[in-house]
Curated annotation (Swiss-Prot):
Gene source species: Brassica oleracea var. italica
Keyword Oxidoreductase among UniProt keywords: no
Transmembrane region(s): none
Catalysis: reaction(s): S-methyl-L-methionine + L-homocysteine = 2 L-methionine + H(+)
Protein name in UniProt: Homocysteine S-methyltransferase 1
Cofactor(s) annotated in UniProt: Zn(2+)
Domain Hcy-binding, chain residue ranges per copy: 9-323
Tissue expression as described in the entry: Expressed in roots, young leaves, florets and flowers. Not detected in old leaves.
Triggers of expression: Not induced by selenate or selenite. Up-regulated by sulfate. Not affected by the status of methionine, s-methylmethionine or homocysteine, or by cadmium.
SUPFAM superfamilies assigned to the protein according to its UniProt record, in alphabetical order: Homocysteine S-methyltransferase
GO biological process: methionine biosynthetic process; methylation; S-methylmethionine cycle
UniProt-listed PROSITE patterns: HCY
InterPro entries tied to this protein: Betaine-hCys_S-MeTrfase_BHMT, HCY_dom, HCY_dom_sf, Hcy_S-methyltransferase
Amino acid sequence: MGLEKKSALLEDLIEKCGGCAVVDGGFATQLEIHGAAINDPLWSAVSLIKDPELIKRVHMEYLEAGADVVVTSSYQATIPGFLSRGLSMEESESLLQKSVKLAVEARDRFWDKVSKTSGHSYNRALVAASIGSYGAYLADGSEYSGSYGEDVSLDKLKDFHRRRIQVLVEASPDLLAFETIPNKLEAQACVELLEEENVQIPAWICFTSVDGENAPSGESFQECLETLNKSNNICAVGINCAPPQFMDNLIRKFSKLTQKAIVVYPNSGEVWDGKAKKWLPSQCFGDAEFEMFATKWRDLGAKLIGGCCRTTPSTIKAISRDLKRR
């Protein structure tokens, strides 16, 4: 299936959902709720090694909550990260592919069950392969600063992402999801890689924001979106892992800057200290607030809405209930 037909899958899903589809929620934090120990440089990806069945269980929980798109557990799954744990190249690549296979297996099992039930309100979900930023691999909080240092060039970022993208594409997800991109340079690297590798799977690119106005690097989103807007490989652009209170302004901003579908999946409002590796006391929003937010974000122009860190299947159920209330 070529890029055009794959892109149509997302467009058709959004249409079936009444104009706005539901993305799943926080994955790593849901693993923690089930007792997984993920205080590790690999973060949620460590469960690909230790407990793949738990990963499938979390996917199922989000599907049952009403997610139309499930995102794989590969956000912090990188070949250099696996190699540093003593795994071979073959084992590292196999784990990356496993992240997609687990999500696909969960999606297919869930759909096989509910599609036989009359009157259900579910859609056959799409699987998006998560690709975390270079800063996520560094695990030093730089995905929230955009400061990679002068020695990190466009070519270095492409070299970092290339093999991971190749391996994930070989596993045949429906979408690629580049997440918490902090600067224009990495966004450009991702777009150029998709073209260089002739990737026939549509992708979204999500930035994050620490001020509600710009990318973490300080670059304007107008600058960041220039390359993305010209790419046929990019089906959607947006924001993830930023506070919910930033979304109204950012959706309005993106609506003026792009014709691409807009995707937003904020965190719960809590703030992660990437250096101290802990959540800081801050305003936290619950399911009732997210239910209200979802209506507003849809009305402002978002086409895909979900949750990131510290959101749960309960959050996604509230969002789904609201958006699918015709």
